[in-house]
Amino acid sequence: MTTRKSAEAITYPIFTVRWLSIHALAVPTIFFLGSITAMQFIQR
């Protein structure tokens, strides 16, 4: 890593386009994986 003083002063916002795109894909994926695995244990 190079010693750059300018990079330390940058405050990154939390809600970025990358954050929205990751969570828009990840949150339904985790929800559907959890629901599918829960359905495997349902005895009919």
Curated annotation (Swiss-Prot):
Residue numbers binding heme: H23
SUPFAM superfamilies registered for this protein in UniProt: Cytochrome b559 subunits
Q: Which Cys-Cys disulfides exist here?
A: none
Q: What is its main location?
A: plastid
Q: Is Aminoacyl-tRNA synthetase tagged as a keyword?
A: no
Q: How is the cofactor bound?
A: With its partner (PsbE) binds heme. PSII binds additional chlorophylls, carotenoids and specific lipids.
The GO molecular function terms of this record are:
electron transfer activity; heme binding; iron ion binding
Q: Which cofactor does it need?
A: heme b
How does this protein assemble?
A: Heterodimer of an alpha subunit and a beta subunit. PSII is composed of 1 copy each of membrane proteins PsbA, PsbB, PsbC, PsbD, PsbE, PsbF, PsbH, PsbI, PsbJ, PsbK, PsbL, PsbM, PsbT, PsbX, PsbY, PsbZ, Psb30/Ycf12, at least 3 peripheral proteins of the oxygen-evolving complex and a large number of cofactors. It forms dimeric complexes.
In Swiss-Prot or TrEMBL terms, this protein is called Cytochrome b559 subunit beta
* Higher taxonomy: Eukaryota, Viridiplantae, Chlorophyta, core chlorophytes, Chlorophyceae
